[in-house]
Regions:
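A broad, low-specificity signal for short, low-complexity segments enriched in glycine/proline
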Residues: 9-12, 62-67, 112-116
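Glycine-rich beta-alpha loop elements in corrinoid/cobalamin-binding modules
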Residues: 32, 39-40, 47, 51-57, ...
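N-terminal beta-loop-helix "entrance" segment that forms/cooperates
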Residues: 57-73
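Generic signal for short, ordered secondary-structure residues
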Residues: 18-19, 72-73, 100
Length: 164
């Protein structure tokens, strides 16, 4: 996908809270992706970008009651809607960066969202290598093996695997 010949990897925190409400946000840097980015930069000549798809700059405070009520309905509806604005944002980010590799961190609560992000990457360019790691793939590796949108599942700490 990258015509300039420079290898590029896009590391993604998939959306989760933003699926409950368009102004909810994960207002922290995805530290695990930061460690991966640092390791990749230190040991390779690849360009690396970290994208937190769960971050909304003008967010509001989360209400727990919303997460389990109307927000949960919204969450499920957005997972089923490929034209939702969050998926357009993910698509645009991948299209603009033009990565050779997309790495997606996944916890069990955001695994469906991570799978959608992986499918979007494959729809853009089937040659993009899609890797997933994090708690969910480490514990539930069979979920990764049963999904064609992932090329590689990383079990445990990913720093050494990503450099390889």
């Amino acid at each position: 996908m990258n015509p300039q010949g420079k290898n590029k990897i896009l590391l993604i925190e998939p959306p989760f809270y933003r699926l409950f409400h368009d102004r909810y946000s994960l207002n922290k840097y995805p530290l695990s992706l930061g460690y991966l980015a640092g390791t990749i930069r230190k040991h390779t000549d690849w360009d690396v970008m970290v994208y937190n798809a769960d971050f909304m700059p003008k967010s509001i405070s989360m209400r727990i009651s919303h997460l389990s009520g109307a927000g949960f309905t919204n969450y499920r509806n957005i997972l089923k809607n490929p034209s939702a604005s969050i998926w357009d944002e993910v698509r645009t980010t991948i299209l603009n960066y033009k990565p050779n590799v997309v790495g997606i961190t996944s916890k069990t609560p955001n695994f469906e969202s991570a799978s959608i992000v992986a499918r979007i990457a494959k729809e853009i360019d089937n040659k993009i290598i899609v890797i997933t790691g994090g708690p969910h793939p480490s514990i539930m590796s069979s979920d990764i093996l049963n999904r064609k949108e992932f090329d590689i599942g990383v079990n445990g700490e990913g720093e050494e695997t990503m450099v390889e």
